[in-house]
């Protein structure tokens, strides 16, 4: 029975991924806010009834897609910054890498176009998954008060969505702004103290 349950769960996961892959192809072609469930079902090669078995609403499908891509980006970013050790630099590189990777992905970049409804920013702002991943990353930089980390994580998400919708003049300009206005505030106090040559808080 356990083996059957595992196979069933795996088939469900594969079917859901196939639907999300079809939705992603549509997101590269048109405004994500304008794409309905009928179009996604057709692109995925399934019926509406089948689509609704996996995602009970368009909002649920969008959320699943955003969370899948957020986790994927998170894994790729951790690989890219694996050799960066110093916490402040690690934070800076992770933010600039996130911006670059989202912009380089047409399906993701479409969610942050200012000429369309700001669904990317809205979803990022209310996603517990995105906030939790941001908080986990900040925790990896050094110990700090959990409430402070959670608040900073939410602020980092808002800062990222703001830059995705309203970019700086170029990458160098954005990097300078992040280094000046974000890194000193968001880097944990313990890490900042170590860099300054002082022991951090116990």
From Swiss-Prot:
GO terms for biological process: regulation of DNA-templated transcription. One of its GO terms (molecular function) is DNA-binding transcription factor activity. The keyword Transcription applies. Pfam families: TetR_N. Residues 13-73 form the HTH tetR-type domain. Coiled coil: none annotated. Residues 36-55 bind DNA. Keywords: DNA-binding, Repeat, Transcription, Transcription regulation. This is Uncharacterized HTH-type transcriptional regulator Rv1255c. The lineage of its organism: Bacteria, Bacillati, Actinomycetota, Actinomycetes, Mycobacteriales.
């Amino acid at each position: 029975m356990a083996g059957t349950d595992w196979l069933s769960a795996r088939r469900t996961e594969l079917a859901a991924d196939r639907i999300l892959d079809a939705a992603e192809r549509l997101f590269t072609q048109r405004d994500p806010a304008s794409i309905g469930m009928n179009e996604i079902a057709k692109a995925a090669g399934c019926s509406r009834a089948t689509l609704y078995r996996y995602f009970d609403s368009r909002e649920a499908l969008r959320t699943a897609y955003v969370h899948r891509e957020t986790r994927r980006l998170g894994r790729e970013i951790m690989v890219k910054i694996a050799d960066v050790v110093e916490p402040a630099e690690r934070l800076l590189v992770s933010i600039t890498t996130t911006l670059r990777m989202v912009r380089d992905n047409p399906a993701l970049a479409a969610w942050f176009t200012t000429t369309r409804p700001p669904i990317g920013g809205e979803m990022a702002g209310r996603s517990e998954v995105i906030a939790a991943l941001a908080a986990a990353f900040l925790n990896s930089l050094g110990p700090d008060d959990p409430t402070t980390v959670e608040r900073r994580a939410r602020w980092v998400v808002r800062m990222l969505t703001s830059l995705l919708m309203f970019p700086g003049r170029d990458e160098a300009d954005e990097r300078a702004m992040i280094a000046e206005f974000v890194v000193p505030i968001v880097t944990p106090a313990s890490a900042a103290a170590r860099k300054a040559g002082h022991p951090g808080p116990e």
